[in-house]
């Protein structure tokens, strides 16, 4: 409604109100004394007027009836405010109507929808055909969502891809690989930070073909863990953690004696716990420890497992008394460990793979610092300086060791 029309409407209301007032004055002059006339109450218009009512009448010294014109002005102001709000709402609706048609084009562009058909694999063509049927973006952490993303129930698969697409460069032509070549390629790609996203996309492009292969399943779950680490958005991290956990749980059910399935289930339980309350954190902590121990029995020569076990022990050793008490109240037992136990696991990782990682050296330095063995702490800080800094975790570990070295040299 144009602003000029608003003005005309308000002016009309004011003229009408003035006319009613004159009519009332005329009526009171000709009516019999003592007869009162009541004005009807205004009906509530939602909560806008807060049930504003007109008082019946009052008389001045000469007995002349005076209508509460202030009330009338308040009502007019409310009407004007309502009309203004309606105009703003109409403007917002108009904006949305213009924006919505562009949304599909934007999404398809982000997903590589402008790539010509002859350059897209059959898997991608099927994916693009389903895109117009998508009506909403699924971001819940339900198991159904995870099954969909993993390729085991495909109804919502494209919705997930639409929610958190990987860079467009990886949505180009898909190279069909056999299982052995695919596994070798994704293992090689994830050795670098930049290759992890490509590794994830490569696995996702082959999920329909190798969905029932155990070696594929646990690597796909691992890739979701990689995407969790790479993401900086909380909702994306939660999305990747929950789907990865469900995929790794399914892998365990299919292959309970495969240590990698237990390893990545433990890791993803740890990631999921970051978004939970205290009770669920403790519950996931028990799951982490349980499946990590199983994985160590099945893969006794895997240094990563001992590094994770060391981190668990170190974290538990640092729990406050109140945190341990709450855990005992909720679960009937207190998680317990010591710095010495953590140190043992970190040393085991170093024994299996000398120079295993910057973070492992950092925790070795922390353990020795806590045990007041400063020379050993400095030794591992210096060894860490010889290692390349590749990942974000490496960089954070280097910064922490610089702090440790500074504090030890004081």
From Swiss-Prot:
Membrane-protein topology: Single-pass membrane protein
Top-level taxon of the source organism: Eukaryota
Listed Basic residues bias regions: 122-131
Phosphothreonine PTM positions: 139, 154, 157
Coiled coil: 68-110
Gene that produces this protein: RMDN2
Subcellular location: Membrane; Cytoplasm; Cytoplasm, Cytoskeleton, Spindle; Cytoplasm, Cytoskeleton, Spindle pole
High-level lineage: Eukaryota, Metazoa, Chordata, Craniata, Vertebrata
Listed name of the protein: Regulator of microtubule dynamics protein 2
